[in-house]
């Protein structure tokens, strides 16, 4: 692959990731109040949300490893992403507090910490990822006394800068530890892709991941424990992201990557993918006025699901048209201007900001 060649399937994966994020946020916004109905919707949120965010972060790692960055570039890009996170928080007061760290602040922190999680300790990419996994497991054990409960409220409540710092590192919705795992996974894919063996590696990892995930499913059945939940008592939990979740999500991302790189299954989302940052940030804005509709009109589970689907499809169309007709007025374009090095930025090589 030449340095200036775009990979359509990377843009397609990015477009798919942002659509899944839109769907998950819409489902969380318009969740039915009935506990029995909410169980069905929670499976949707858990399943799709459990794959959307890891895919987003994996793509970030893939893009960041493409070329070296100066510290000035890192700070500029990270600052931009933190500012976008603040805008998202203001647009979704029903989900976040103004200074709650989220996935965009995680991405900003990953930009700054790439010399750690992206370090090439050995010539073998999988070994490098293994070294990071050992470091993450050690940090998780060391910092476990500081971990907060598996509860959404505790992870978005940010009454002070100190709490915000802990949320960024460990106790938030998308903390650096252990989410750096997915960035390192993306970097690993990128390294193997240069040698055209990425698909074989991903197939092997997928098989291992499927076996481990099936084993956790069998355990949950025998122990009569819920297999997967966003929060609470389950074998796989998203908040916090435990090891069984990391394995399952990594497996899902690997399978999606194989599908995208060997077929044209996600190519239709490629234009959307090139405005993914813009769509991610702006799709929260309507929630400022619409987030109480389900309570005001007592929506049923079916109505909530239909609204979620329509909202997601609308943003798929908006994102595609945005790229085709007004791409100059996007956060991606603004980021390139802010970085002040257009030749080194996202468009030539599917970089992470798109």
Where are these regions (language model features)?
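Alpha-helical transmembrane segments and their immediate juxtamembrane cytosolic regions
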Residues: 1-354
